[in-house]
UniProtKB/Swiss-Prot annotation:
Biological source species: Medicago sativa
Keyword Acyltransferase included in the entry's annotation: no
Region (Disordered): 1-23
Keywords for the protein's UniProt record, in alphabetical order: Cell cycle, Cell division, Cyclin, Mitosis
Role this protein plays: Essential for the control of the cell cycle at the G2/M (mitosis) transition.
Protein name: G2/mitotic-specific cyclin-1
Coiled-coil ranges (or none): none
Lineage: Eukaryota, Viridiplantae, Streptophyta, Embryophyta, Tracheophyta
Family: Belongs to the cyclin family. Cyclin AB subfamily.
Subunit and interaction comment: Interacts with the CDC2 protein kinase to form a serine/threonine kinase holoenzyme complex also known as maturation promoting factor (MPF). The cyclin subunit imparts substrate specificity to the complex.
Tissue/organ expression: Only expressed in organs with dividing cells.
GO BP terms, alphabetized: cell division
Amino acid sequence: MKFSEEKNVSNNPTNFEGGLDSRKVGENRRALGVINQNLVVEGRPYPCVVNKRALSERNDVCEKKQADPVHRPITRRFAAKIASTKTSNAEGTTKRSNLAKSSSNGFGDFIFVDDEHKPVEDQPVPMALEQTEPMHSESDQMEEVEMEDIMEEPVMDIDTPDANDPLAVAEYIEDLYSYYRKVESTSCVSPNYMAQQFDINERMRAILVDCLL
């Protein structure tokens, strides 16, 4: 026993610096081992990789939930929807029963009508053979009324009172002729008009002519 203790002492020399032994003891502490065990989740080390469900699986789950309305909480909206569906189904069944009663005779048999052996009078007339009546629109009627009004209005002739008075007509023509003879000299443009305009050059004349044309 003494020999073994001496052997252990001789094999494990004391470290006066205290750095190496403290580092080895710190690595094998129980607290660190417990922390490492806590990080292991279901046999997978941290960080964990989460396996997400595919989109099709989610849709299947949602459809199953919608198809099973027993476990769905009954809200006001859901209750109103159920009531409306029940009433619509009841109305549909009553309509079907009424149609069945109306289409059957007293013996309960249905009456079938053959469309192929209808009389000629009951068959519809083709559109090409139908007699189309002319449709007069309101605009056409208004145009006809306006034209009639224009034709009915007489045109006033202001020269009818002087038709048999040759002197009045002659004096009127002579006055016009004398007036235009007096004004003719003032209205005519002098032939050297452009030569007298010193501010207008040849280029400006060309531009002016192009604009006038």
